[in-house]
Amino acid sequence: MRLVNLMTLTIPALALSGSGLAAQQAEKIEITEWDVPWEESRPRDPYVAPDGKVWFVGQRGHYVAWLDRETGEFKKFPLDEGTGPHNLVVGDDGTVFYAGNLVRHIGTLDPESGEVEKFWMPDEAARDPHTLVFGGNDDLWFTVQGGNFVGHFVPASGDVHLVKAPEAGSGRGSSSRPYGIKMDSKNHPWIALFNTNKIATVDPETMTLTTFDLPDERARPRRLVVDSNDVVWYVDYSLGRLGRLDPRTGEVEEWVNPSGSESRPYAMAIDRSDRIWFVETGVRPNKFVGFDPTTEEFFSVTEIASGAGSVRHMFYEEDTNSIWFGSDANTIGQAKLPPPRPRTTTDH
């Protein structure tokens, strides 16, 4: 394990915009949901494998499973009782990587045999691996929410390096709660520190963690995405906002969500047109929202038929221009997006 120094960058004053959307003008999208056959298992964090199967975890049911979208067939691979899998990703060879959130490991699952191999965290304090993302060098980066780390995992060697995140002085202990994580084009991970008003990144060469302070101390970024210009977009769960952070200038701009300050935006994705999508979980039913950075407008709001309860994480499938999600209503869903639009690129 390597512990590193922390750097902090100061962000200029916040620019806050209104929602820019009238309810009657909102564009609707088609959402299909499949009922998961294992009741109250909290299916979540789907990921589409190279063969088209939709893999997901059952956080409360302690399993990994897949859905065949064409036939509606499900297949379950039970994990050890008490594993609490929180998230998964699938490699190019079909290998499934899952976060054993309650048992301090990252596991791999062979999609044919169901055989599991476990890679343990090198520090017992890293008790709850949370969200995984592939890097660009046959590696993975991940968050450890309660344990307060950002991690780097090399499957070929089994090596795990942990970077300590900053301490926080508010709510749910001292952990800054590293939560959502995504990669930029330079293979740097970006992390939402959910118990703070900070967004972090790690230099993969030095393993130094740098934080960006968001201007509103009440902000609580939960999930984020990185666009084609390496601009970071995040949802502020506490204040009901969508935010944009430009790491080159430190400029922050935010928009009030269509459902307002109590919208509780959670799961997030970005499509190949750089349009931003997220789910408002503070309203019933949950609402699937689209934002166009070009016009700076929320252009799409669609209610999720099951109600959803909460949608926690999403996966964009470029081949079908759709987003996959799991819901607390015990469903796996597919949101079919409007046709892609040209995106604007910036030299940097």
Residue ranges of predicted features:
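A short helix->beta-strand "capping" segment at the edge of beta-propeller domains
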Residues: 24-40
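Beta-propeller fold detector
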Residues: 32-35, 75-80, 117-121, 161-167, ...
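Blade-level signature of beta-propeller repeat domains, shared across WD40, Kelch, NHL, RCC1
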Residues: 309-348
